[in-house]
């Protein structure tokens, strides 16, 4: 995740009218909590998403019968320490195009919430590229 790159924008998924070369995506970076408490991660996605913290799968949402459908899923609470950077990996898979005549961009968002943090986008100040980024 690059701090100046939006991470919650629709992806250019394949459609019958405009095939896109990108059918999967992977974001790697680091995340820092504001408070030492349990955080819940939420994924809004129309296909399939996996969210990992420090290499451990904390959230997975699969496409229903390999067909896209918009749904929100939440992780179990994850304990994080204030100011400590942890690795975050988000993987996305576009399963199939929408039916002819139905134009829909792919969607995927990752939010967080905690006792002190209202559910919403993870602020850019709490994200940074992984070590060795650009080297």
Regions found by a protein language model. Name each.
Residues 1-40, 44-135:
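Extracellular/secretory pathway-exposed regions associated with glycan biology
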